[in-house]
Amino acid sequence: EIFLVTKVQPSDFAYKRTLSAVRESFRKLDAGYIDLLLMHWPNPDIPVAETLTALNELQAEGLIRHIGVSNFSPALVQESMRHATIFSNQVEYHPYKNQAALIEQAKAEDYLFVAYSPLAEGAVRNDATLKSIGAAHGKSAAQVTLRWILQQGLSAIPKAGSNEHR
C-alpha cells in the first residue's frame, strides 16, 4: 500500500495559489486523492490561516485526506492547529539535532512527528559511538539510529544513500 505525500511550496501559500498548486499536483499525480499534503517551510509573509483555509477546502472536496506541516516551530504548529487538524510535522531530526520541544508537543497534541534526514546525511555511519553500539548488537550505526528514533514513538523517512535510488 502506498501513502501518497506531497508538499505545497511557501511561494504558493496565498489562498488562490494554494488551491491552484494543489489541484495541479493532484492532476499530475493522477491519483484518487493525496493522503497527506504538507505545507513545506513557514512563509512569514502569508498567514498560516490563509493557506489552511484553502487546504481545508481541498480536504472537504476529497482531494486530500490529511493536512500536515514541515519545518514548523512549536508556536507555528500551535497556531496552525487553531485553523486545521494537523496530522504531522516533518522536521530534520537525528542524534545531532535536538528537537525535544517539538517531540514533546507532538506527543501532547497527538500529531505525528516525522524525522527527515534521520541519518544526518550519512554522518551517523562514521560515528564511533553509534558504530560501537551497533557492533555489540550485530547492527550498523544507521540501524541503531533508526531504532533509536522508532523507540521514541516517532516516524523516520531516511533518504536513499545511492544516487540511483534517489
Where do the PLM segments sit?
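Local beta-strand N-terminus motif with an aromatic residue
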Residues: 1, 31-34, 64, 86
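A short, structured active-site edge motif that brings together acidic residues
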Residues: 1-12, 33-42, 71
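Residue-level signal for secondary-structure boundary sites
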Residues: 12-14, 97
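Short, conserved acidic/polar surface loops in the N-terminal third of protein domains
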Residues: 14-19, 48-50
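CE4/NodB-like, metal-dependent polysaccharide N-deacetylase domain
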Residues: 18-38, 57-61, 111
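Beta/alpha (TIM)-barrel catalytic core signal, keyed to glycine-rich beta->alpha loops juxtaposed to Asp/Glu
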Residues: 42-166
